[in-house]
């Protein structure tokens, strides 16, 4: 790798190209994770039909359904699940560990038939207490490729965080619909990427009121160039940077008390949601201008992904109390 400047330059360019493609893949993964209310509605397929020829292994509160192709993923899945449980106990105070099913779908066609959703790699069904997974780059994942491992961990933690958040709201006797969808998705993305040093990248801020419901979400994804999952992550990240990570549980509790997210937000943060949106947009647009003048987009993507790759196993070490 250090034979000479020519080879180093060529290797660096090749690596950058590969990493940029993988970074784009990472962004696609983040745009293909869903909370699903009514699984099986598209074709009438049931969980029993999906899992009929699968093996089942129980681990703590989870029943994991898999085929021989996913068997070697079980240790990583269990370790990642342990971390997901631990980090959600810390961040939102959910510790009851209600039983949940985790299903490895064998192919995209069957996942689409069950979920009624196109181009997804994961979903969470509150009604059936079920996480559906279709890991991308499965060959690389089975080989222990660090980027593939990180993306898989992130996917599972994201979906489990939806589960934990819904159960916490049940404990507080609060309707999940009281919280805008940006909070649901942003929280799951933020927890899945906790402790990672993610570089800011440029995008136009989607108005917060366009990220309230599932319909808003899908329309915003079609109308704006912005990755709405990414923006929602930064919204939660900005809140925790400004007020500390405990602001998450405070906002949840205050919203539950007042029965209104905007009132709960103001009670917890002492500022209005409108003001937060204005400050968020002002800060981000300022950062965007500075970043545009210094870094090209491919370099930002590479920097971000290199950080992810270097720290992709940190989730699990944190879960062991280090």
UniProtKB/Swiss-Prot annotation:
Keywords: Signal
Position of the signal peptide: 1-32
Domain of life: Bacteria
Keyword Signal attributed: yes
Entry annotated with the keyword Signal: yes
Listed name of the protein: Uncharacterized protein YhcO
Source organism (scientific name): Bacillus subtilis (strain 168)
């Amino acid at each position: 790798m250090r034979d000479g400047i020519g080879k180093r330059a060529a290797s660096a360019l090749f690596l950058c190209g590969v990493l940029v493609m993988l970074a784009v893949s990472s962004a696609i993964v983040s745009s293909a994770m869903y909370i699903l209310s009514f699984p099986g509605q598209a074709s009438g397929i049931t969980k029993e039909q999906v899992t009929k020829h699968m093996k089942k292994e129980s681990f703590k509160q989870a029943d994991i359904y898999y085929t021989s192709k996913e068997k070697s993923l079980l240790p990583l899945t269990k370790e990642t699940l342990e971390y997901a449980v631990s980090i959600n106990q810390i961040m939102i105070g959910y510790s009851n560990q209600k039983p949940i099913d985790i299903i490895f779908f064998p192919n995209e066609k069957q996942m689409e038939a069950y979920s009624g959703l196109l181009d997804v790699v994961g979903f969470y069904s509150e009604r059936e207490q079920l996480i559906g997974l279709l890991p991308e780059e499965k060959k690389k994942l089975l080989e222990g490729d660090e980027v593939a491992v990180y993306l898989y961990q992130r996917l599972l933690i994201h979906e489990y965080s939806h589960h934990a958040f819904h159960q916490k709201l049940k404990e507080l006797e609060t309707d999940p619909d009281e919280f805008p969808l940006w909070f649901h998705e942003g929280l799951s993305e933020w927890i899945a990427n906790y402790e990672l040093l993610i570089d800011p990248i440029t995008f136009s801020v989607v108005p917060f009121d366009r990220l309230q419901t599932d319909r808003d979400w899908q329309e915003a994804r079609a109308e704006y160039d912005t990755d709405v999952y990414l923006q929602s992550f930064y919204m939660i990240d900005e809140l925790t940077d400004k007020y500390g990570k405990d602001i998450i549980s405070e906002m949840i509790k205050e919203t539950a008390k007042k029965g209104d997210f905007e009132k709960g937000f103001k009670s917890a943060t002492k500022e209005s949601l409108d003001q937060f949106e204005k400050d968020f947009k002002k800060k981000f647009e300022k950062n965007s201008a500075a970043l545009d003048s210094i870094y090209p987009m491919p370099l930002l993507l590479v920097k971000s992904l290199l950080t992810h790759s270097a720290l992709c196993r940190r989730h699990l070490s944190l879960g062991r109390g280090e």
